[in-house]
Amino acid sequence: MYREAFINRLLYLLNLFATSVIFLFFCYDFFLILFAWECIGLFSLLLVNFYSTRIYTIKAALKTFIFSRISDMFMFIAFILSLLIFNTTDLSLMFLQIPFLAFHYIFIGHSAWHFLTFFSYCLITSGGIKAAQFFAHVWLPDAMEAPTPASALIHSSTLVVAGVFLIIRFSVLFEFTLFTNYCLILVGALTLSFGSITGVFQNDIKKLVAYSTISQIGYLVCGCGFCCYEEVLLYLIIHALNKAFLFVLVGYTVHFFNGNTDM
C-alpha cells in the first residue's frame, strides 16, 4: 500500500483504533469502557470507509455505522442502569453489590423486570452485535472493503473479540443470571453453525475468511455461555494472532493476483 495517496491517514487511524482497544482492555471503570467503546466504533467506521469514492464501500460503511450505533445504544442503557442502581461506575464496587441485587426488580411502565437479567441482556446484546453474532453478522463481510491491515484488525484481533471480552469482563454478573447463559449458548451455536456453513459456499477469498471469523467468534460466545472464561480468553488470544496473520497472507495473495479475490 506504499503507493496509496492517503497512507498517512490510514496509519493514523490504525494507531488510534489500536489505542482505543488497548484502552478498553485495561480500564476498570464503566464510563471509560463506554468511552473506549464509542472510540472503537468511530475509528472502525473510518477505516471501513477509507476508500470513500467507491459506492460499495459507502454502503458497507453505512451498514457498519447502523449496527455500531445499535450496539452503542444498548451499552449506554447499561451505563445509565449502573448509575441508577449501583450508584457507581467502578466495576469492583459494582461486582460487590451484585449478590445483594439478586431479587431486585425495576419497573418499566406496568411491567416488572429482574434488574440483573435486564442489565445482562443489554450487555450481551451490545457485545453480540459488536462480535457479529447471528442476526447481527451482516456488517462483518462487508467490512472487508477496508484495507487489508485494517481488515486484519477489525476481523480478528480487536473489534469482533472486543464484544467477547466485554462478556468476559462482566462474567461475575452472568453467574447470577442463568437464563442469560442459555441465550449465549444458543446464539453462539447458531452463529458458529451459520458461519461455517455459509463460508463453504463463498467464492470470494476475503469473504470466506470473514465467515470463518464469524464461526470462530460463535465458538467463543458459546464457551462464555458454559462459563469457561479462562479457556475462552486463551482461545481468543490464539485466534486473534492466527487470524491476523491469515488476513495479511490473504491480502498478499490478492495483491499477487492483481486484486483478484475470486477463488
What are these regions (language model features)?
Residues E38:
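Short phosphate-coordinating micro-motif centered on Lys-Gly-acidic
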